[in-house]
Amino acid sequence: MEELYNGIRLPDVWPPRNMDDMSLSELPVPYLENRPDVALIDVGRQLFVDDFLIEENWLEKRFHQAVLDETPVLAPETPMEWNKGVAPVAAPFTDGCWYDPADGVYRLYYHAGWFDGTALAVSADGRHFTRKMLDNQVGTNRIFVPKPGWQRDGSCVWLDQETEHPEERYKMFHYFRTPEGDVAQVAVSADGMHFGDPVTTGLCGDNTSFFYNPFRKKWVFSIRTGLPSTPWYSRGRSYYECDRFMEGASWANDQIAFWQRCDVRDLRESEPGTIYNKNLPPQLYHLNCVGYESVMLGLFAIIKGFDQAHNAVCENSGVPKHIDLHAGFSRDGFHFSRDNRSPFIRCTDRPGSWARGYLHACGGLCLVSPEE
């Protein structure tokens, strides 16, 4: 039985195979239901985001929303990003943003041109970014060139500051649409600008991503999964972990475990006054995580409504999918407490706003630099 840094003991069967994917009941958080006799507080600052460290409580717990700057750090400018005027894009589609202490700059990996490039922009302050021209394709800031006919979908780039292998310092996942069918691949890089030969992963859906659990030294893949219990299509997440990123990426179906979904407490409205289809519940569109102080922080991307869940409806109506980002917290890296069901980052339906509709968490979630 593995004992974690905080005194929690994991069961012999790990990851658990008992998460309910057949209903909308709340998912369990075992370490809150049966707390260890002694909670260890030696790792990281202790965050009172749940009741794990609280013996008695007569206070009101209050969560706060993020305050957004309406001005984007990137907007489509280059021919690749403008994509001949068809769905221009210069934004993370997960991808990643990191402060790299090796060269003292912030690196933003982003989706450049719809279903096209994965590009790199750099910044000295994390707010003002310039495109880093690279030699992978002359005149562009692509970090790699896809095969002819291959179109990128979701992507994730991670800076691994704990690796003992310098050539694997940057790790990347891509989901591709190809003439032969969809495929997902991983690759590694020493400099985050030139990646080596890829390895094909196990089966997964688009918007799959990965993260590093620093408390258990595990690489975890957040795998898009359809729920079997509903008469409509509903999204959830499955979980797969490994010790070595490249060697462990080719998982078999029986190695993954059902992980997370929405439940009866998830809100069926988002912006005040905006009500979506109440006949069908919200869906878990994505889940990205990062180790933060003494917990794993997760951002649950929850899609609201039903009609907008279909791409054709969105395209015909000119309205993007409505996705808000909700915060969750885990002390074992698998089970999440979500006491607050209001969005941490709320999208808007306001036409012309950069925060309209289709919000995605960036790989790494939050930046930690020498100053803040």
Language model features with spans:
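Extended C-terminal regions of large enzymes
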Residues: 360-362, 369
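Beta-rich carbohydrate-recognition and catalytic domains
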Residues: 1-285, 290-356, 370-372
